[in-house]
Design a protein with these regions (language model features):
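Bacterial N-terminal signal peptides that target proteins for export
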Residues: 1-17
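An amphipathic, aromatic/His-enriched active-site/gating alpha helix that lines ligand/cofactor pockets
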Residues: 30-47, 69-88, 95, 104-147, ...
Length: 287
């Protein structure tokens, strides 16, 4: 960073303040009332996130639950107040050290502002030593954008402690496709029949994301450069639906993906259990 430390800090604080003001103005302009204690399926205040990080951390053995509790307690509101969103946070099944979360930003420029405000701010400065001591790797990060406006990530309202006393429910699935260069769009079209079968098997599609091929404008946080990738996200009611309906369909359509000729390797299916305060979860109103 250029300039004196004091100047740089003032500039960061001003940029962060402007981002917060912009977010608050947007929220007031778009706000709509709803009955108290009712969890809405969609909140207009949470629109227009066009940049996402799909972050897969490795946590020290035996410490994942502790890390998840720190995350749920400290981070969701901290990001929201800066105009970003923790769209979902999860424990990876079949990987005892895997913690995955999705962070959204309105634009790529806002990403840099939010990161500077957060990682040079008071919340992270107070807790970074504790959290960094629990993380063994945090560099497995995909920088993504929605495939199209219609396939944007589903940003659900925050957990309501009154109507959802047991915390986030359901199962989230993420399927990651390593796509050949310049073939993402055609692969997405040819994969649509398979994705339609996922939805028919009980999955609520929560977004389709593809690699955002831009320069990392906050290089202090590395991102992967081995793309392109396509990530399909879905939410299931419970384990029974996952095992009885969804998993068999993924096995049946595997040949479609292989025969397409557009992939660099086999798709990776990740089964994710939401942390108690994860936004991305199965809503009580979804029957």
């Amino acid at each position: 960073m250029r300039g004196s430390p004091g100047f740089c800090q003032t500039r960061r604080m001003l940029a962060a303040t402007l981002a917060v003001l912009n977010f608050c103005i947007l929220a007031v302009a778009q706000s709509k009332s709803r009955p108290p204690n009712e969890v809405a399926e969609h909140d207009p205040n949470l629109n227009s996130f066009q940049v996402f990080e799909f972050r897969r951390y490795s946590i020290k053995p035996g410490e994942r639950q502790h890390f998840a509790k720190y995350f749920d307690t400290l981070f969701p509101e901290a990001f929201q107040q800066l105009g970003a969103v923790a769209a979902g946070s999860f424990l990876e099944r079949g990987n005892e050290t895997g913690f995955t979360w999705i962070r959204g930003f309105h634009t790529i420029d806002v990403r840099a502002v939010v990161h500077a405000a957060f990682y040079y701010g008071s919340v992270w400065n107070e807790h970074r030593d504790t959290l960094n001591n629990l993380i063994t790797d945090s560099d497995n990060v995909l920088l993504l954008r929605p495939l199209s406006p219609e396939r944007d990530v589903l940003i659900l309202p925050a957990i309501d402690p009154v109507t959802e006393p047991n915390g986030a429910q359901g199962v989230v699935v993420a399927q990651i496709f390593a796509v050949k260069k310049d073939e993402t769009e055609v692969f997405a079209r040819e994969a649509e029949p398979a994705f339609a079968r996922y939805r028919a098997a009980g999955a609520r599609e929560a977004g389709v994301l593809v690699t955002l091929d831009v320069r990392n404008n906050f290089p202090q946080l590395p991102i992967r450069t081995d793309g392109p990738y396509l990530v399909w996200l879905g939410i299931l009611h419970d384990n029974e639906i996952l095992q009885r309906e969804f998993i068999p369909v993924t096995e049946q359509v595997a040949g479609i993906f292989k025969a397409s000729g557009h992939l660099r390797g086999a798709p990776e299916l990740i089964v994710l259990d939401p942390t108690p305060r994860s936004r991305m979860r199965w809503l009580p109103s979804w029957k």
